[in-house]
């Protein structure tokens, strides 16, 4: 396992934020009917992958990708709730809990 450096953690945090932004912008694009939001969404995805590529220079790929995807899903869920009034049913909440437990287990491994 590589030694953790804060700069790589910062790159990972930026990648997560950009992924969330990309997902929210994609929703705002209304299926790319609103092209400006669609283009911004694509730019955010490219920037997120660029930041992730910097993060994996100092964080194991398996850990970085799991955290990126997991936190991205959880935060996008929260954004959907706050911005769009979207709600999960009980099965969805079980999935979120399993996701978070899995992320913790990967980080501890």
Swiss-Prot record:
Signal peptide coordinates: none
Keywords: Cell inner membrane, Cell membrane, Membrane, Transmembrane, Transmembrane helix, Transport
GO molecular function: amino-acid betaine transmembrane transporter activity; antiporter activity; choline transmembrane transporter activity; spermidine transmembrane transporter activity
Stretches that traverse the bilayer: 6-26, 36-56, 64-84, 88-108
GO cellular component, one term: plasma membrane
Topological type in the membrane: Multi-pass membrane protein
Cell location: Cell inner membrane
Domain of life: Bacteria
Chief localization: membrane
One Pfam family recorded for the sequence: Multi_Drug_Res
SUPFAM superfamilies: Multidrug resistance efflux transporter EmrE
Entry-linked InterPro entries: Small_drug/metabolite_transptr (IPR000390), Small_multidrug_res (IPR045324), Spermidine_export_MdtI (IPR023737)
Biological process (GO), any one: glycine betaine transport
Sequence similarity: Belongs to the drug/metabolite transporter (DMT) superfamily. Small multidrug resistance (SMR) (TC 2.A.7.1) family. MdtI subfamily.
Subunit and partners: Forms a complex with MdtJ.
Entry-linked NCBIfam families: PRK10650.1
Role according to the record: Catalyzes the excretion of spermidine.
Name listed for the protein in its UniProt record: Spermidine export protein MdtI
Source species: Salmonella arizonae (strain ATCC BAA-731 / CDC346-86 / RSK2980)
Gene encoding the protein: mdtI
